[in-house]
Amino acid sequence: AMVGVEYYDSYKKGFSASGYGSPLSDFQDLNYTSTAAGVRQIDSWHYRQRILSFFGRVNYDYKSKYLLSLVLRRDGYSKLPKDNRWGTFPGISAGWVLSRENFMESCSNVLSYAKIRASYGANGNVSGVLDANGNVVTGLDYYTVQGSYGIMKDKDGKIVPNYNGKVPLMINDLPNPTMRWEKSYTFETGFDIGFLNNKYILNFTYYNRHTQDKFAEITLPSHSGVSSFLSNNGEVQNQGMELELTANVLRTKDWKFTVSMNTAYNKNKIISLPYNGLPNNMQDAYQVYTGRKLA
């Protein structure tokens, strides 16, 4: 058995300043840029995300014939709304090594190993709410704002806010208080067979994965003032089969030569989207809707 705790904390902050109109190109110093109104600009930002996880696993092995594993995770993500911050993800897997049964001894010279396996489990995902740099994209922050907006200089050259002497805050994205974990439920079964003292090994796997509350952006009308809106807006099914054959052609103390070949068949399909995905689910010039097969 095993239990554990994992804590992840990421904090990023940055500062930038820019200007133009410098008479010199050899010195990169804002002091040489133009002092005209609106030329020099400054900006700063900060961002933090935290993940707290509790997990455990219990394995059972009876005479290397009957195998059972139980796992459980509970994860909390700070950037999700408070009521949806935590997710629980269980899993179970089992295996039966037939080649260790007494009734298989008569064919052990040919069938050296045989195992049947199956598993079912849930996984949580929040990576869809982050961009390539690890920053949260639209729809998660209740207050995503831009700070010193509209800074300018008065007639005496003094820097002042542009809006009636006040520093305004501008909402950058619409909040989504219903955001929650993207969840995938996967069933998998298959077998592993070894022939002639495992000189030839055959592996077969079938899987069926059902993803719920999938992250995707919904395009909004231009008059709303926001171009898109991140939500848990659909269900997707992925299923397929994989077959692999391995031949251990040469096995000596100093040399090993192995040849493997594999093939796979996969089918992905959209199960559901709000309003059937039409007309507000154009994503990267690719229209998605209920029943459509994905490449």
Residue ranges: model-predicted function:
Residues 1-293:
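Extracellular/periplasmic, surface-exposed regions of secreted and cell-surface proteins
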